[in-house]
Structure formats: C-alpha cells, structure tokens
C-alpha cells in the first residue's frame, strides 16, 4: 500500500471528555493524534477534523459534508471516526454513493468507540488500529470496523442489548 491514509474526525464517543463537576460529556479537541502516537503508528496518516458532534445530532447535511470530503479526497484509503449510534446511517449513505459511482475507487472505514478515549479503558485505540489496518488491506468499498471485526456497509447493525456491532441476519 502506498500513499497517505486520510483520517476524518467527526466526533463521537472517541473524542468525548468528562466534566468532573456535573458528570456531563463534552467535546474539546480530538485525541486522534495522541492515539496514533500512543499506538506507535508508522503509517502516513493525515488527520482532518470535519466536525465534533455526537452522532445522534448528525443530520443529512452533516452526512453530505462527509460524503463530499470523501469524494474530493485524493487518498484512496479513508478512515472516519464516528459516533456508534448512527454509524450505520453514514455507512449506508457512503455505500450508496459508491454504488452509484458518486465516489469511486476508495476504501472507506468508519470506526467508533463505546467508551471515550479519555477514560483510559476505552476500546478506541484498538478500534483505530484495526481500522487503519483494514483501510490498507480491504478492497474498495465502505466498511464499519469495531472490536477487531469489519462489516460491509449493507450488512451491519449496532446491537444495543450487547453493545456490539454485528452482521444483519
């Protein structure tokens, strides 16, 4: 694999901070550069923040921004950090854009975390590493990467009862 992996930041649990005074979660800055350094990433990754929002607040206009950035991106390998609550919706929008050739010849991986990186016990670092590996090894298409597994955009759902992603049965 040659070239740079583009890492688009959209917010989600990955980047949430904890307010010790009132117990709320909020966004400050992305942790992605710190995570890449901590994970000793030796792949050329360019980080770009598109937005810092909870995925429950994401709407079609936000998805259009993500889609447009993926379409214009010179890299053929893209990782998108995303909140897990609506990740399938964004994956579907991107997958449909690839199906109708609005986006072509790109491997796009959406990745999230169930626990904020700032908490220390987060699954985010593991998920990010897996997403970067999948971006380099999977054929062009749109995928969701969580917990060491990857799923095609049209065959994934979040199982809220167990807190994991799974294939649609």
Positions of PLM-derived features:
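Active-site histidine-anchored catalytic micro-motif
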Residues: 2-169
